[in-house]
Amino acid sequence: MASWLQIPKNSPFSLANIPFGIISSSKLSSRVPAIAIGDYALDLSKFASSGGFSQLPVIQPHLNVFNQSTLNAFAALGRPVHRQVREYIQKVFSTETPFPQILRDNAALQKEALLPLSEVTNHLPMQIGDYTDFYAGLNHAYNVGVLFRGPDNALQPNYKHLPVAYHGRASSVVTSGTPLHRPQGQILTNPAANPKLPTFSPCKKLDIELELAFFVSTPNDLGHPVHIDKAEDHIFGVVLMNDWSARDIQAWEYVPLGPFNAKNFGTTITPWVVLIDALEPFRTVGLEPGNRESLLPYLREKRADTAYDIPLEVEVTNAGGEPTVISHSNAKNLLYSFPQMLAHHTITGCNLNTGDLLGSGTISGKENQTEGSFLEQTNGKNPIKLADGSERLFLEDGDTVILRGMAGTEGNYVGFGDCAGTILPPVQLDL
């Protein structure tokens, strides 16, 4: 796809993408919806109020969605509308645009609505009512299971029959670039001791989890599950996600009800939501086909290619140091698809709402340096060497982690942008 707007060939926001987000700037009096294209954000509030959507009848009754401070109202319009809006914007920016008067030849509107990304502030794209994190990364689940239970019992008996998940904390989901303080809590420093007595301490095993996550668009009613064949139409779009994890706090607290404080202190997502339609060209078979016979019928999809071939990477930079890419993985390293996660979540009659966030689970490969967490790479014993010669078993204060994901070819990349966060020292407590 070629555009009249100059777009860097390595941009994750090519004309093939058109992700949606929420921005503010010194030019704007409030937060507004926008799309990212190349090095620019298109202010959809200004674009809509200036006749930008005049050639798209389907959105005319709903132009007020572009005056909201979140994308929830737009997401609730449903996938057919999202698709038409995205395709329309692609036509507006294409070299052979059928609507040159809208923006290409409209210098005044370009000046008003096209803002350099370097001059805008990104915000959470959605008001998130609930957040659920799945555990669909089979390789990660196996690797961690081996560490704790050995290879013979690495996976629980239910793992290949249902997408395991836990309910996370929506209030501490933050957008890329938000720093997080090192968490503090109860830690068992001597697991062999009897009796087992915890101490209160800053986390000493602070970790990351490389994930994708998706937002719910249209809700389902309480008591009415979403059929697997219709589940994808309830998905608005996808973001990169870092599920920060305090492994030592987790080890002491997680039996019998799972993680709590170990994961509730911060979850970072990318600010630009990549619509599910933009990922369609990258469909592939995941770790197992989506239509495999071993699944119960409510989870069995009609097609095999229910995953996405999206290269992912993890970069770590220590304070004042050089960046080091410590891992390369791929989004296809998942056992369950997004529709399967959504169908399973609702099978009991649970109602999902517009803006709910559902994480994939940690996406790890099978080889060394394809793991999506420090726990898998180091096991707390085998340090990762950074570019400046320093070593890491887990994250230290001042470390910055950036997750990236981008599919496609030069000039037509579909990516998420950076999912970045820096670790600050723990807050001083008066205990």
Curated annotation (Swiss-Prot):
Q: Provide the protein name.
A: Fumarylacetoacetase
Q: What class of enzyme is it?
A: hydrolase
Stated EC number for the protein is: 3.7.1.2
Stored InterPro entries? Fumarylacetoacetase (IPR005959), Fumarylacetoacetase-like_C (IPR011234), Fumarylacetoacetase_C_sf (IPR036663), Fumarylacetoacetase_N (IPR015377), Fumarylacetoacetase_N_sf (IPR036462)
Instruction: State whether keyword Metal-binding applies.
Output: yes
UniProt similarity note? Belongs to the FAH family.
Q: What does this protein do?
A: Use of phenylalanine and phenylacetate as a carbon source.
Query: Tell me, what's a Pfam family for it?
Result: FAA_hydrolase_N
Annotated GO molecular function terms are: fumarylacetoacetase activity; metal ion binding
Query: Which SUPFAM superfamilies does the annotation name?
Result: FAH, Fumarylacetoacetate hydrolase, FAH, N-terminal domain
Q: Which domain of life is it from?
A: Eukaryota
Binding of substrate, residues: 135, 149, 250, 254, 362
Q: Which residues bind Mg(2+)?
A: 243, 263, 267
Source taxonomy lineage?
A: Eukaryota, Fungi, Dikarya, Ascomycota, Pezizomycotina
Required cofactor names:
Ca(2+); Mg(2+)
Question: What are the catalytic residues?
Answer: 140
UniProt KW keywords: Calcium, Hydrolase, Magnesium, Metal-binding, Phenylalanine catabolism, Tyrosine catabolism
Q: Does the keyword Calcium apply?
A: yes
Q: Which GO terms describe its biological process?
A: homogentisate catabolic process; L-phenylalanine catabolic process; tyrosine catabolic process
Q: What else is known?
A: Disruption of the fahA gene results in phenylalanine toxicity, secretion of succinylacetone and the absence of growth. This is analogous to the genetic disease, type I hereditary tyrosinemia in humans.
